[in-house]
């Protein structure tokens, strides 16, 4: 999961050099040395977190969901789903659905920090939600923040 997400994130950053430049500028303001790039500081960087969230949305490492049983009947998109039926969500399709995202196929980290954005952020569930949420969620975010920030701080990337 981690290597796929790092590959995807740097792929999108390199395909969108303006995003990489903005991220480099944000990370460079955190500290004078690479050792100062702690997760406590990095967690407060809006653009770094937006890049990570946008990568989770547009290229989810885990596409399937955990099957859950419908507790009571419900009509979804005109189709009745009776009680007891197992359902799951396809994360890739959800992350690319124009019903939830403006320009869903465009890598746009700004959508995560723009207060006027019309996207439905509840449609991005890279770690699931509720009782079945991944227990390693916070650790994964910490690892991605530190790894991405240190790579961007130490190296120059280009295509």
UniProtKB/Swiss-Prot annotation:
GO terms for molecular function: heme binding; iron ion binding; monooxygenase activity; oxidoreductase activity, acting on paired donors, with incorporation or reduction of molecular oxygen. Gene3D superfamilies: Cytochrome P450. GO terms for biological process: biosynthetic process. Its cofactor is heme. Heme binds at residue 134. Keywords: Heme, Iron, Metal-binding, Monooxygenase, Oxidoreductase. InterPro entries: Cyt_P450, Cyt_P450_E_grp-I, Cyt_P450_sf, Cytochrome_P450_monoxygenase. Disruption phenotype: Leads to the accumulation of the monomeric compounds fonsecin B and flavasperone. The keyword Transit peptide does not apply. Its EC number is 1.-.-.-. It is an enzyme of class 1 (oxidoreductase). It catalyses: 2 fonsecin B + NADPH + O2 + H(+) = aurasperone B + NADP(+) + 2 H2O; 2 rubrofusarin B + NADPH + O2 + H(+) = aurasperone A + NADP(+) + 2 H2O. SUPFAM superfamilies: Cytochrome P450 (SSF48264). The keyword Metal-binding applies. Disulfide bonds: none annotated. Pathway: Secondary metabolite biosynthesis. Belongs to the cytochrome P450 family. Cytochrome P450 monooxygenase; part of the gene cluster that mediates the biosynthesis of aurasperone B, a dimeric gamma-naphthopyrone. The first step in the biosynthesis of aurasperone B is the production of gamma-naphthopyrone precursor YWA1 by the non-reducing polyketide synthase albA, via condensation of one acetyl-CoA starter unit with 6 malonyl-CoA units. This is Cytochrome P450 monooxygenase aunB. It comes from Aspergillus niger (strain ATCC 1015 / CBS 113.46 / FGSC A1144 / LSHB Ac4 / NCTC 3858a / NRRL 328 / USDA 3528.7).
């Amino acid at each position: 999961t981690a290597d796929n997400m790092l590959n995807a994130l740097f792929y999108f950053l390199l395909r969108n050099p303006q995003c990489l430049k903005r991220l480099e500028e944000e990370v460079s303001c955190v500290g004078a040395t690479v050792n100062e790039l702690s997760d406590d500081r990095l967690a407060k960087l809006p653009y770094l977190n937006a890049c990570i969230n946008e990568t989770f949305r547009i290229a989810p490492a885990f596409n399937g969901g955990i099957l859950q049983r419908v507790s009571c009947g419900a009509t979804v998109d005109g189709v009745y789903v009776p009680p007891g039926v197992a359902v799951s969500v396809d994360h890739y399709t959800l992350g690319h659905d124009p019903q939830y995202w403006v320009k869903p196929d465009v890598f746009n980290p700004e959508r995560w920090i723009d207060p006027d954005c019309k996207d439905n952020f509840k449609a991005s569930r890279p770690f699931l939600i509720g009782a079945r949420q991944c227990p390693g969620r916070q650790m994964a975010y910490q690892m991605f923040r530190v790894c991405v920030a240190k790579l961007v701080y130490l190296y120059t990337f280009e295509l």
